[in-house]
């Protein structure tokens, strides 16, 4: 034992290589697969503890995974013997201890629990809560607005100013305090109101007007004298009506308007007034300011400065002789109230099938102007010099100079600045 030959050799006798250090071989547990058929042979499968967690199961279906997991757990726990050995010598089969069996059962249960939890997470859908944005279907709710508005007229609004001046009215009807069950139409009520106002005594109206004029200028019902000067009067008394009819006689209605379409509002108002006046069947003297500058001077003279105010004359304007009636707004209002026909009832009327009664003039085509026959619309006339040989008498020097000045081109005395004259057929 103590001799040199008994020492361990460091090299192999055959290959002369050094021995490798002893390696700890990791032992693994073997699982015994029982034979299913008589022809099958028994074999052992070695599994290490580190490979238990890396087993890949089939994901085909839930029942299929459960079946494979149960088979694997049974095979893992059912083994009763373990094959041991160092790899160089013969393997020795020994029986498993109770501790090893309990560890294998615990590992199988843990693996089954992990697989079950993963499969349940995959099966449960992830539902994201959403707020409903669509109104659920149902019948619309009916709201009675009369019930909501009931009693609102009697309630004083907090937004209303306490200094608000209340309105007043006059009860002129004989049965004004009585209320009938049936409500009259609006147009009947307006006619009754107009008849009631006509029954007022003129002295009462004048005294009431004076009292309103004496109020301070800041008062909402104050009336100034300037308002009565600008507004034409149409409500005449019986005496004034007789005087007016005698003075008017058969005077014509004169309309100052424009046919230019540069300002659309002015042109449309001029057309409206022309249609209203022609519908009454009276003779209208239409004077187009854009065709003749003399009409513009006449209008300025008739209106005066109080209507102009330095701003400019607006068109159209209607006159009865030299009496001003009004513009477009006044004519519309009088026509709607039925007072325009009464006011112009004494004017000269147009006979049927005559120019001005819906028929156009054959000479001017309702333009009321034709080209000048003297200058043919050029506004210029040329006078030639005439030399008389038989005339031996010589006139004075002044007369000769005057005659020389009249020769050549001269301004046409018959037409206006546009070379036009008024139509001799419809503007007689």
UniProtKB/Swiss-Prot annotation:
It comes from the Eukaryota. Residues 386-401 have a biased composition (Acidic residues). Residues 386-405 are annotated as: Disordered. GO terms for cellular component: plasma membrane. Coiled coil: none annotated. InterPro entries: Glutaredoxin, Thioredoxin-like_sf. SUPFAM superfamilies: Thioredoxin-like. PANTHER family: GENOME ASSEMBLY, CHROMOSOME: A02, GLUTAREDOXIN DOMAIN-CONTAINING CYSTEINE-RICH PROTEIN CG12206-RELATED. This is Uncharacterized protein At3g28850. It comes from Arabidopsis thaliana (Mouse-ear cress).
């Amino acid at each position: 034992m103590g001799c040199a030959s008994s020492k361990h050799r460091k090299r192999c006798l055959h290959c002369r290589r050094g021995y490798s250090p002893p390696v700890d071989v990791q032992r693994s547990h073997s699982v015994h697969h029982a034979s299913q058929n008589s022809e099958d042979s028994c074999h052992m499968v070695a599994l290490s503890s580190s490979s238990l967690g890396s087993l890949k199961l089939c994901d085909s279906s839930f029942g299929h995974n459960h079946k494979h997991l149960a088979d694997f757990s049974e095979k893992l726990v059912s083994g009763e013997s373990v094959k041991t050995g160092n790899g160089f010598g013969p393997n020795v089969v020994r029986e498993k201890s109770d501790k090893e069996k309990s560890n294998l059962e615990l590992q199988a249960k843990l693996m089954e629990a992990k697989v079950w939890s993963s499969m349940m997470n995959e099966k449960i859908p992830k539902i994201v809560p959403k707020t409903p944005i669509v109104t659920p279907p149902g019948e619309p709710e009916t709201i009675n607005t009369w019930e909501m508005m009931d009693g609102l007229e009697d309630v004083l609004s907090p937004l209303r100013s306490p200094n608000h001046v209340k309105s007043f009215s006059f009860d002129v009807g004989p049965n004004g305090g009585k209320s009938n069950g049936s409500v009259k139409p609006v147009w009947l009520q307006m006619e009754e109101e107009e008849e009631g106002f006509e029954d007022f005594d003129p002295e009462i109206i004048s005294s009431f007007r004076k009292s309103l004029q004496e109020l301070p200028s800041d008062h909402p019902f104050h009336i100034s004298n300037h308002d009565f000067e600008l507004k034409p009067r149409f409500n005449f008394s019986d005496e004034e009506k007789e005087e007016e009819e005698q003075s008017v006689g058969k005077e014509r209605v004169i309309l100052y308007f424009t046919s230019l379409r540069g300002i659309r509002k002015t042109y449309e108002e001029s057309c409206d007034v022309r249609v209203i006046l022609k519908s009454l069947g009276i003779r209208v003297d239409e004077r187009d300011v854009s065709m003749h500058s003399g009409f513009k001077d006449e209008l300025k003279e008739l209106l005066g400065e109080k209507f102009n105010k330095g701003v400019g004359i607006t068109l159209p304007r209607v006159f009865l002789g030299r009496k001003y009636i009004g513009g477009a707004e006044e004519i519309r209002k009088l026509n709607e109230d039925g007072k325009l026909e009464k006011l112009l009832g004494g004017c000269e009327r147009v006979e049927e099938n005559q120019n001005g009664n819906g028929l156009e003039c054959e000479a001017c085509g309702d333009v009321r102007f034709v080209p000048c026959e003297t200058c043919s619309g050029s506004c210029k006339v040329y006078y030639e010099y005439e030399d008389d040989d038989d005339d031996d008498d010589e006139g004075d020097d002044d007369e000769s100079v005057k005659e020389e000045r009249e020769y050549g081109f001269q301004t046409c005395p018959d037409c206006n600045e546009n070379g036009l004259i008024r139509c001799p057929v419809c503007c007689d």
